[in-house]
């Protein structure tokens, strides 16, 4: 049977992307589709103008949301939603808002080499659970190695500009397709925006599998 293609548009500083990724993975497992789907990660930088070195998270979030207290309230809401999915958000140790271009390039590299499995979740966990700076190349090399990628190959890749043009093109195409926020997931002909309940993913897979059966 032909594999069901799914497109996942994420940014690795988006907490709802991690929550959506966990819900989607659970549904895929529950439906026994782990070997029947072909997932493609599409990059989307929420902060494309972020300095390469990132910013102090307190300063950035205070400026963005008007106060640190408001930012903390939003973080608490996310952490509660994450706990329901078995995810740990340790915002107290997250002190940087990183530029995520390097992280997106790393995933692009891993997908090209057929070894992106586990890397996406590892990046989310490194940032939200462990407070690691995923805008730092040395940190990304460690995360990649922990996820099973060759550290020397990743080091050479991140030291180059390879993939940057492709990332920009993928982001531009996503915007042309009407994607204005993340997470955004396409399963068959169904586009799902936001961290929706499991039932929404189940319905999308039911529609997509039914369409594939008709085609075949």
Where are the language model's segments positioned?
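Structural alpha/beta surface segment adjacent to cysteine/selenocysteine redox centers
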Residues: 22-130
């Amino acid at each position: 049977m032909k594999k069901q293609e799914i497109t996942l548009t994420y940014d690795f500083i988006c907490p709802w992307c991690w929550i959506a990724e966990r819900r989607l993975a659970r549904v895929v497992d529950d439906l026994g589709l782990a070997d029947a789907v072909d997932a493609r990660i599409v990059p989307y930088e929420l902060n494309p103008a972020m300095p390469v070195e990132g910013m102090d998270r307190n300063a950035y979030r205070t400026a963005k949301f008007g106060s640190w207290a408001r930012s903390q309230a939003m973080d608490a809401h996310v952490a509660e939603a994450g706990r329901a999915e078995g995810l740990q958000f340790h915002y107290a140790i997250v002190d940087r808002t990183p530029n995520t271009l390097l992280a997106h390039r790393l995933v692009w590299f891993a997908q090209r080499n057929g070894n992106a499995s586990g890397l996406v979740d590892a990046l989310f966990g490194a940032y939200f659970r462990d407070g690691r700076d995923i805008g730092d190349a040395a940190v990304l090399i460690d995360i990649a190695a922990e996820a099973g990628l060759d550290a020397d190959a990743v080091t050479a890749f991140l030291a180059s500009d390879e993939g940057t043009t492709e990332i920009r093109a993928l982001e531009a195409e996503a915007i042309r397709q009407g994607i204005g926020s993340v997470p955004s997931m396409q399963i068959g002909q169904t586009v799902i925006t936001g961290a929706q309940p499991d039932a929404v993913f189940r319905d999308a897979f039911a529609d997509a599998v039914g369409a594939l059966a008709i085609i075949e």
